[in-house]
Structure formats: structure tokens, C-alpha cells
Amino acid sequence: MPKPRTKRQAIRDERKKKRRETHEETHEENHDERQSKRRRVDGEDRDEDEDTQQQTYNDAGDHPQPFHGNGPEKEFFGMLADEEQEYFRRADELLELNQFPSPEERHVFLQNVYKEARGKELKLASSQSLSRLMERLILLSNTRQKKQIFNAFAGHFLSLVQHRFASHCCEKLFLESAPIVTQELGGIVPETEGNYDEMEVEEDAEPDNTMENLFLMTLDEFEEHMGFLLTDRFGSHTLRVLLVILSGRPLDDSSTKLLLKSKKKEYISVQGATGASDELTHQLRAVPESFTQATKKIIQDAVAGMDFTALRVLAKHPTGNPLLQLLLELDISLNHKSDKSSAAASKDTLLYRLLPDAPASLADETSQAADFVNSMVYDQIGSRLLETLITNCPGKVFKALSHNFFGDRIATYVRNDIASYPALRVLNRFSKDDLVEAVKKIIPVVPLLVSKARYNVLKTLFERCDARGAYEEKSALTRALTDALGPNPKDLVPKLCHLVEDESADKDQFQQSPQNKTAVAAHGCHLVSTMLKTPGNASKVAQKSLVALPPDLLVKLATTAMASTTVLTTALASPAAPQNEFFHKALVGALAPHAAELAQSQFGHNVINAIVEIPSRGTDRCVPFHVKQTIIASLAGHERALRDSWMGRSVWRTWKGDMWKTRRSDWVKWAKEVDGPAEETKLKPWERRKLEQQKGPQPRQPPRETAKEDKE
């Protein structure tokens, strides 16, 4: 939000005045009708009534009251007539079914729906049953139509983002409009489809504004209420979406989706929606300088007027904490990494407000910064903010944190269910020397970690030791883990992956839920997969334990869950450990008799697909070619059953079963392509001589000295 915005504000004030006059003229005429309709549909759309919505909000118990009192007054946009509701419900059903006789009729139908929706956008967005239609219209709209929806929502965004259903429409509008900002910034004007030109043009239509200005004018409406939106149930989520757009982050990145997704949000889609290109959604987007300034302004306004105590309360607020994490990450990125000099001189950034006088103050146990870290590390909600702080803070602040808090107490933190997660973030940033010291302190508590199923701690230690080159510590961790699991090292995979039930553990944890058991088994499978990818004793022990499994447990491992299947696919893709050269041959040989069964499994078919990629000859990993022939013959014997499921069809395509049936020699050549150049070096002398004759005589190169003389 740049300071010179008087022209935008004047346009906004004029629009507000026009809407206010129109609203006052029609308010008295529609008052009685609106009240009757609200009473009639109160049981169906009760969330549209503010009192009922607030009551539901309080009774839920999941979301506390807003952080800054009651906040601004919410608007009621009225309700549609019965005929209009029926028309739009029918239109929503037709768009979802997409059973139009021809594309032309679909375009005509959409054109009529857009015409009918003009002037009713606010009512549609705030309707429980019709907000889905509004989201579909946003997905189908072109650039000019998105700008028209922006103008229809203008002046009411503050109320819309606090609404249960309208907030989703705002988020969809922001996300779909974000790539247009980048296109306009590069001088690319997105084309509008000619099918909608007739209904777009109006006599009194205002000239098109840039999407950048539309976003900035939307932010102007939130400027005085940032503190309230931090903890609003729906507004905080919409503000997260806006911050992601302003920062230029990838919209379809996995971390971004995790930040923006809602557990209760229904995924809305529609056939024929024209999405943005992958470059504008999967990569960093170019954003104008005004967006960067607006992000800094939001960070300042959001925590303006909050003292240290208020920030601590906000850090433990279930609704405000995720947004505070994003604000802190953007604050460090914009103020401490991009502009280090001004950040050091200002000391008024969000980082320094959470950790006053850092890094020097972190050495003082009585300081506010030290008190903040100690109060967050064991808090279920506050520890998430501490994770973000540890991951993104500057190096000098991290050194002070690790030296004064985590260095000596790392073994204590990793044993705790909550404090272990900030400790893992610290381990990811440790240098080799600090990591070696941390491993020495954690090794004595490995049996306790195994008994508590803290497998993610051990997984992180193996990964970081491999990345930092701490080979002795990897071997020590492997010995400590195998000793903690029992005297027999071959029990590593069955116990970590929970392939066998431990009666003693069941007695101690008789109240453990099935979901918790599945999650613990998944963490154990991830640990085994990490060990298989780690060269040295870790992979050697894991491979020996895997080969020692009986066939029934191997099949169970391949078919239980995706995490357990990953153990086998990782083992097949990893090189054999020293003194275990026949690992792949033994593993595939045990799986081959069950190939047809695994090929029809939801998870097991991935294992069969991974076998075909293993070469028949090689030093690191190989499977004899006759074993592959045995597997394809077994699959061909169950071809009819394989074709009845998508898993079986996937395996049949991957193994090229049709080629094996009709062109056996071509299949043999294809199956040996993965062997690479090693196949040519193993040729017999007469085969190599025949190959040279086919290539023809090659011209001899002149000696180097003769070539120089010719040039002279």
C-alpha cells in the first residue's frame, strides 16, 4: 500500500456514495419482504444471520473470540427472490453436470447466467447454497469479468471476508486474479473471449482498471482493521491468501497449499475453466514494487499497538498463530535478508519485537527474548511459531538461540512430544561440529526415543549426518538403534514398520487409537526408507533385515500402506551395500511368486513397476533377466484379472505385456535397454567383431605432429 493513493481513494469514496444512495432508496421497499424471507429460510441458511453465526461460533469452542473485541459491523446484503434462487440453483446443477448438447449452447447458457448475476454478486457470495455458483463463475470468467466482480465487491470486502461463505469467494477471486497482475506487469494484456463481449459492454461502464490497483484498493479497506483480521475466524484465512499473492510465492507449491488449505473447505471445480500457465502458478511470480511495500505495511499495521505481552498472547492464539507465522517469515525475508542495513538500524521489525535486543538479549535468562523462547518451546501452538523463527531467522540470531537454549538441552527437547519439533528445526541448521556434539548427547536416550516412537528424530539425525559427512556418528546411531530394538538386528524392519504385534507394547498402550498406530507405523517406515538411502552401516543393516523377512511379511509390507510400499521401492532403487551384492536378486526372488497378487493391489503395484527398471547386469544393483521373464509370464497368466483394475492395467502397460505376447524379441530388447552400455562390454569376441563390421571402416586420425605441419 504505497502512500500516494489519493486518486484511488477518491474513486472509492465516489462509489461508496452511489451505493449508499441506492441502498437508502430501496431499503424501505424491501424491508418487510427481507424480514419474512429471513424467517422462512432461517433453518436452511442460518449462517447468514449474524446472531446465529456468532452463537455457532461461540458454541464450537474451537475458535476463541476475536483478539481485538467485536470488530467492525457486518453488513447484510439481502436475499434473492424465490424465482431467482431456483434459477441459480438450477444453473449451478447444470454447470456441475456439464451435459450440454454442444459447446455453443453452453456458451449461450453461461452468457445468460452472467447477465442474470449482474448486480446480485453480493447476495450470491453470501448465500450458503449459491456461493458455490459464485466460485464457479469466478473460475469461468475472463480478465474483464474478474475485474467486474472486483468492482461489485468493492467497498464490502471487509464484511465479505468475515462471512463463512463469501470469504471463500473472495479467496477464489484473489487466487484466480493473481497471475493477471504478473501478465499486466510484463506488458501482456490477457485476451477476453468474444463469447462474452455482448454482455460485458455497458453504456455507463467505467474504464478498466489494472488488476494491481484493484488489489491495492482492496487492501485500503482492510488498513484500519488488520489487528482484528489477525484472529477473525474467516478473515485471517483470507488475509493469508492476500499475503501469499503480494509476496509472489508459487500458488500451487506444496508448502503454499499447506498454508492456505482449510480442513472443512469444499473443493469447487467446473468443466471448461481456463487456468493460468504453470509458470505463473508453480514458480515465483514477478510482482510490482507496490505489492512489496504493501506487504511491509500490512506487517506494521497488523501488530501496531501491541506490546510484548499482547504478542505472546497472539502467538498462542489458535487462529492468529498461523497468520503470525506467515507475517514473521515475510518480515525476515523483506527486512532482514533483502535490506539488512535498515533492519539493523530500525529494530522495529516483527522479529525484534518478538525477540527484543536480540541476539545479545538471548544470553540473559531474565530478558523478554529468553522468556519468549522458554514459554513457546513447550506450548502446543506457540512452538509452531518458534519453528518458523528457527528456520528463517538470520544466522547471528540462530547462533544465539542454539548456544543458549538448544545446544546443551537438545537431548531433553527431543524426548518431548512438543519441544521435539523446534529441536528438529535446530538440527537441520546445525553445522557439522554442532551436529556431532548433539548426536553424542542424543545417543544415550535412543532407547527412550524408540520406546516413545519418536522415529522422526532418528530420521532427521540420519539425514543430517549424511548431509554433513558425520560418518562415525551414523555408525554410532545405527548401533544404538539396533541395540534398542533387541538383540537380533534382523528385527529392525518388522518392529519399525509394525509388521508384527508387540504384546508388551499393546499392554502398555492399550488405549492407542487405530489412527495413531497407523501414524506411528508410517513414521517407522520413513525411518527405514531413510536408512536404505544412507550409505554405510545403516543401509547394510536395513537391507539384511529386509531380506530376512518371510514372504508373507514382505507381501504385507508391500500392500499395507503407501509408506510401507515406499520402503520396498526405495530398497529396489538404492545400490546394494558392501558384502551384500545379491540383495536385489534375493528381494525380487522373494516377491516374484506373488507378482500377480501385488499387481492388483492399490499399493503393491508400485513395487512390481519398480522391478522392471532394475538392470540385468550391474555392480550396484541387478536382477537376473530370467527373473523378469518369470514375472512377465506370471502376469500374462492373469491378464484378464489385471485388465479389470486400474492397478493391473498400470502394471501391464509398464511391463509392456502386449509387446511380450506379440513381439517377444522386441520385448527382450526393450527390457535390456536399462542395462545401458554395460551390455556392449559383455559381448563375445565374435559378436564384437560382427558389430564392428556393421559399423564399417573408420578413417584413421593423423598423428598430432603431422596435423600441425599440414596446417603450417
From Swiss-Prot:
InterPro entries in UniProt: ARM-like, ARM-type_fold, NOP9, Pumilio_RNA-bd_rpt
GO biological processes: endonucleolytic cleavage in 5'-ETS of tricistronic rRNA transcript (SSU-rRNA, 5.8S rRNA, LSU-rRNA); endonucleolytic cleavage in ITS1 to separate SSU-rRNA from 5.8S rRNA and LSU-rRNA from tricistronic rRNA transcript (SSU-rRNA, 5.8S rRNA, LSU-rRNA); endonucleolytic cleavage to generate mature 5'-end of SSU-rRNA from (SSU-rRNA, 5.8S rRNA, LSU-rRNA); ribosomal small subunit export from nucleus
Bias regions of kind Basic and acidic residues — which residues?
Answer: 21-35, 673-693, 702-712
Annotated spans, Disordered: 1-75, 673-712
Q: Which domain of life is it from?
A: Eukaryota
Q: Where is the composition biased (Basic residues)?
A: 1-20
Give GO terms: molecular function aspect only: RNA binding
Q: Which UniProt keywords apply?
A: Nucleus, Repeat, Ribosome biogenesis, rRNA processing
UniProt cross-references to Pfam families, sorted A to Z: PUF_NOP9
Gene Ontology CC entries for this record: 90S preribosome; nucleolus; preribosome, small subunit precursor
Compartmental location: Nucleus, Nucleolus
Q: Where are the Pumilio repeats?
A: 116-151, 221-261, 368-403, 590-633
Q: What does this protein do?
A: RNA-binding nucleolar protein required for pre-rRNA processing. Involved in production of 18S rRNA and assembly of small ribosomal subunit.
Report the sequence similarity comment from the record.
Belongs to the NOP9 family.
Its recorded name reads Nucleolar protein 9
